[in-house]
Amino acid sequence: MKRRNADCSKLRRPLKRNRITEGIYGSTFLYLKFLVVWALVLLADFVLEFRFEYLWPFWLFIRSVYDSFRYQGLAFSVFFVCVAFTSNIICLLFIPIQWLFFAASTYVWVQYVWHTERGVCLPTVSLWILFVYIEAAIRFKDLKNFHVDLCRPFAAHCIGYPVVTLGFGFKSYVSYKMRLRKQKEVQKENEFYMQLLQQALPPEQQMLQKQEKEAEEAAKGLPDMDSSILIHHNGGIPANKKLSTTLPEIEYREKGKEKDKDAKKHNLGINNNNILQPVDSKIQEIEYMENHINSKRLNNDLVGSTENLLKEDSCTASSKNYKNASGVVNSSPRSHSATNGSIPSSSSKNEKKQKCTSKGPSAHKDLMENCIPNNQLSKPDALVRLEQDIKKLKADLQASRQVEQELRSQISALSSTERGIRSEMGQLRQENELLQNKLHNAVQMKQKDKQNISQLEKKLKAEQEARSFVEKQLMEEKKRKKLEEATAARAVAFAAASRGECTETLRSRIRELEAEGKKLTMDMKVKEEQIRELELKVQELRKYKENEKDTEVLMSALSAMQDKTQHLENSLSAETRIKLDLFSALGDAKRQLEIAQGQILQKDQEIKDLKQKIAEVMAVMPSITYSAATSPLSPVSPHYSSKFVETSPSGLDPNASVYQPLKK
């Protein structure tokens, strides 16, 4: 045991390595390498529009799955994959896209720099600040240049997989703490039983033990090591409480450090050994409980044997019951656990006890057989106590078997739940694909609606321009009408002087008004066709409104179109009113023309009467005077005659009060 302590101290010496003596060149080269790798990955991300740093956690996940399948079996590897996949789905669904990409990239680069040999120092902190600043200031906003749908599952894996590994690490840490607590409890019990064993030894052997301890302390100068090497059975049990760690704990910590180093080299902080299979851990705990119970039973038997040996020393008559003289328990603390009292049993009760204890572990069966002295035949209390211990051990074994059965049932339940989760995940994937297709179709419909709205806006602008042009024409027509009215008034004023010129001007004016009326009717037809087209478009928009309830923009566009159509209808009604006024003016002009023609006919009739009277007078007058009188009058023709009167009948009623257009 002395050599073991020396070897352990020698093994721990190389672990205390001084980092100050490391060269500056190596550290600067290391961080320069980090910067070069980071710059190359960012360049590849920008050129190929894909974030390659997300592939590193995926590669770690594949390695951890392979290690779990290799060392812990298929069931645990499948369970680990399902848990990781569930965590990835949760991160994918509930974390926004920008924050998901930011957290994933930041975590990858921080973890990459964290797992260095120097640990936390100024260069690592500066690199962390640089990475976080670049991710938050530049890459957090520029997500348009990347394939978001392709990178998003990998980003979710970068967050979900570390969460799963941290959960398994926390579980292993809690189990480790519980194991240490159990070891401390067992250590206290062993200390108590060791004190009982020491008190059961004869005083001479206690004096020898003290002398040996003093010699060891004087030789090595180790006053703190009292009785850490007394018993080799249940781990070293220190008598002095100053010794905080025993040899198994030191070896466990050294193994933990070696595992941490291997994890830093290979998995960069993700230790697969921390992911323990729950069934194996439960079986180990059951074995540990059985060993603890057997060790407790062995200690009780040893205590009973030492009491019997003390009685044997006090009573010489009871030495006949022993068949073997070597039944004295060795008093040296180093060889106590190696040499058990070889005292064979000689009665049927001990044989029954051996049959009952043969169901337990085979390693402790021989110890139980050898530790029962023969003078217990005369002690029924000890036998009763041993029988009670056997019953307790059987009950403990049954409880451990029940726990094992419960664990197996839990394993089957977990496998069934895993299958259900897989089926649910398939359904969720199908639903997600359907929703993505619907979203794509909705986006396409929205783009088409935008195009239709833009086209309608262009058409509305064209209609507004046409409307302004028509309004200008109407203003010009009004001006022309006023001018025509003024000219008509002037023509009426000069009608008495120039009857023939008035009729010609009136005819030309009538022709112009009819041409204008035809133009206006054509314009009205064109406007009516446009109104019909607009009404059809409005109906289409209403149908689209019924189909698409969420398109508020189209509703506003429809309302605007309705307002514009109403405005156009109002303008068209005003135009029709103007046309009616023009037709009424035309009727008035025709009536005036008919009246003028009637007056002309009356004048012609009067001229005829006058001519007849002149003829009668000339007939009465003498021929000389007649010839003289008629010679200058023969070439003269009346100015107003019936030849100039238009004989075409008019379709207008001169007695009509108000002009009424014909209904179509």
From Swiss-Prot:
The chain crosses the membrane at residues 28-48, 75-95, 120-140, 154-174. Keywords: Endoplasmic reticulum, Glycoprotein, Membrane, Nucleus, Phosphoprotein, Transmembrane, Transmembrane helix. It comes from the Eukaryota. Residues 253-274, 320-375, 630-664 are annotated as: Disordered. Strong expression in whole nervous system up to 12.5 dpc. Highly expressed in all neuronal differentiation fields from 14.5 dpc to birth, with highest expression in the telencephalic cortical plate and mitral cells in the olfactory bulb, and lower expression in neuronal progenitor zones. Progressively decreased expression in fields of neuron precursor proliferation from 14.5 dpc and virtually undetectable there by 17.5 dpc. No significant expression detected outside the nervous system. After birth, significant expression remains in the cerebellum, olfactory bulb and hippocampus. GO terms for biological process: brain development; neuronal signal transduction. Glycans are attached at N324, N340, N452, N655. The keyword Transmembrane applies. Residues 253-265 have a biased composition (Basic and acidic residues). Its main location: endoplasmic reticulum. It is found in: Rough endoplasmic reticulum membrane; Nucleus membrane. One of its GO terms (cellular component) is nucleus. Residues 320-348 have a biased composition (Polar residues). Coiled coil: none annotated. The keyword Acyltransferase does not apply. The modification Phosphoserine is found at S305, S332, S631, S634. Belongs to the macoilin family. This is Macoilin. The gene is Maco1.
